[in-house]
Amino acid sequence: MDDWKPSPLIKPFGARKKRSWYLTWKYKLTNQRALRRFCQTGAVLFLLVTVIVNIKLILDTRRAISEANEDPEPEQDYDEALGRLESPRHRGSSPRRVLDVEVYSSRSKVYVAVDGTTVLEDEAREQGRGIHVIVLNQATGHVMAKRVFDTYSPHEDEAMVLFLNMVAPGRVLICTVKDEGSFHLKDTAKALLRSLGSQAGPALGWRDTWAFVGRKGGPVLGEKHSKSPALSSWGDPVLLKTDVPLSSAEEAECHWADTELNRRRRRFCSKVEGYGSVCSCKDPTPIEFSPDPLPDNKVLNVPVAVIAGNRPNYLYRMLRSLLSAQGVSPQMITVFIDGYYEEPMDVVALFGLRGIQHTPISIKNARVSQHYKASLTATFNLFPEAKFAVVLEEDLDIAVDFFSFLSQSIHLLEEDDSLYCISAWNDQGYEHTAEDPALLYRVETMPGLGWVLRKSLYKEELEPKWPTPEKLWDWDMWMRMPEQRRGRECIIPDVSRSYHFGIVGLNMNGYFHEAYFKKHKFNTVPGVQLRNVDSLKKEAYEVEIHRLLSEAEVLDHSKDPCEDSFLPDTEGHTYVAFIRMEKDDDFTTWTQLAKCLHIWDLDVRGNHRGLWRLFRKKNHFLVVGVPASPYSVKKPPSVTPIFLEPPPKEEGAPGAAEQT
């Protein structure tokens, strides 16, 4: 080891130095502080620039206001200012205001756009078939009405004609077809389209597509049409683009006297269209009614619940007839609207009535059922002292003596526990089977369509077990079930005090209305005094029925009851026929007889203990089911009950008809 010498090429050994944790932390902290100072400085500079820009904007605004004050424009009211804000743009240097309108028609979709805003779009399957109509205000361009008329179905063209005739002159009309709109487009409707200036509308063919824009009483602004090349196909989609020049606000407004009624009218007519003379500038129809008071009115303080949805034109017609009925109390009327729709509430406000909207619950018939429950509950909450409620629907005409009819009969509900309701509707009361407006019946079915409900019945029996939202049941069919009716009956008139005019609804269409509702008899005679009202009580009615059967002439049962000659050509007589009815629910012969009499035949209605009462050839006609009816004892031994066998069902035919 003495001769060892270090190599000069090797680095001398030294202990490795390590920075302490304190110095590392201090170094990082210094860097973070520097970054934070940089960010703070940037933020201050940004705020400074923002303040400078805002100060400049404020100074520019003050300068502009000062210049405007030196040369002020005439003062304008709020409505004019609003109209200015909403008015469409000017085209280039031209002072004329115009709208860009696009209209699309095809097999599965229609849409309308105004200045780039879609105001109609319908591409739902199996819905929206027919002619869609939109009405625009000619001064502002805002949508005043949207309707669809299924002119493939009967009578929808009549509804379209009525609507278009009620639109004020000058309004902008837009029409477009989805799927098919010509099958039931009859000559009257085609003539009206021709009068609007349309060339393609009157010639509209099977599955053609068509788009139209025009001014009522003015020029056509655009039209496109594509013919279907074959019965199995549709016309090509058409897209119509056109400019719509707008007129001055002066042309679009009426100048009525400044009264509370006219203020209501002005608010209504500035928003919606299709209501005819109520918005006439020269001679508007009244919106306040003064029917004669009803002496000793027993229903003056009975609340009236109007069950409504989104059918404002129906609601308008219904409320006009209701408010014209003798003995009406407008303060007792509440309109319940299923959904937050604007136009039905506008109709309610026009007449100065109370309207209540609520959120829809469930779907289809369950939604209607929940709407009824909510409305009935709210009615008795609004009027906690009421013992009864009158229940109406938005698609009913109300007879002039509707409240008189109820006033004369409502005591029966208080005095006879065997009664379920009083209804203004006779299911079998057609023009050829109803005759006597003073005559009343007891029936085992609940007709609805304008009826009186006892509060105790609703609160104690119906409300607690009302069908829940998940049950897709019709509320009226549920009320007719034996579990609810419990053997009780309803009082009805021979001649109805309500008329079901609606042809659009959940369980309604033009075909169904034509077959079962259009020819119902409706009383138009005021001041009818009902006859022998107290004879409608349970025991007294049995005495009356036995009296009628004892006096009735037995018809010749060898004749065909469907032939006109089955009843003699007399007037004022009472006749009786006996039909086979083996048990209480055996309605085979009755159903066939109802079919050939052209009255309600989808289910059994209007019967009392196996007996039906109606008129034929102005004769009182009684039909007794043997042996099920207790009145079978009145059948002479020599008479064989009539049996009518139903025709055999065609293969593939539906098992049951839809019922309302």
Swiss-Prot record:
UniProt binding sites for Mn(2+): D395, H500
Disulfide bonds: C254-C281, C269-C279, C421-C490, C562-C596
Region feature Disordered, mapped onto this chain: 634-660
InterPro entries according to UniProt: Glyco_trans_13, ILEI/PANDER_dom, Nucleotide-diphossugar_trans, O-linked_mannose_GnT, POMGNT1_PANDER-like
Renumbered residue ranges of the record's region Catalytic: 300-646
Cofactor note: The manganese ion interacts primarily with the substrate UDP-N-acetylglucosamine.
Residues on Cytoplasmic side: 1-37
Positions of a carbohydrate binding: R129, D179, R207
Region (Interaction with O-glycosylated substrate glycoprotein): 473-481, 506-512, 600-605
Cofactor(s) required, per the database record: Mn(2+)
Any one GO cellular component localisation term in the record: membrane
Alphabetical keyword list: Disulfide bond, Glycosyltransferase, Golgi apparatus, Lectin, Manganese, Membrane, Metal-binding, Phosphoprotein, Signal-anchor, Transferase, Transmembrane, Transmembrane helix
Record-annotated GG-type lectin domain positions: 97-258
Catalysed conversion reaction: 3-O-(alpha-D-mannosyl)-L-threonyl-[protein] + UDP-N-acetyl-alpha-D-glucosamine = 3-O-(N-acetyl-beta-D-glucosaminyl-(1->2)-alpha-D-mannosyl)-L-threonyl-[protein] + UDP + H(+)
Pfam families, alphabetized: GNT-I, ILEI
Cellular localisation: Golgi apparatus membrane
Residues noted as binding UDP-N-acetyl-alpha-D-glucosamine in the record, renumbered to the chain: I307, A308, G309, N310, R311, D338, H371, E394, D395, L506, N507
Transmembrane segments: 38-58
Enzyme Commission code: 2.4.1.-
Membrane topology value: Single-pass type II membrane protein
Subunit structure comment from the entry: Interacts with DAG1 (via O-linked mannose moiety). Interacts (via transmembrane domain) with FKTN; the interaction is direct and is required for normal location in Golgi membranes.
Family the entry assigns: Belongs to the glycosyltransferase 13 family.
Record comment regarding domains: The GG-type lectin domain is known as the stem domain in POMGnT1. It mediates specific interaction with beta-linked N-acetylglucosamine moieties of O-glycosylated proteins. It also interacts with its product, N-acetyl-beta-D-glucosaminyl-(1->2)-O-alpha-D-mannosylprotein.
The protein's name in its UniProt record: Protein O-linked-mannose beta-1,2-N-acetylglucosaminyltransferase 1
Biological classification of the source: Eukaryota, Metazoa, Chordata, Craniata, Vertebrata
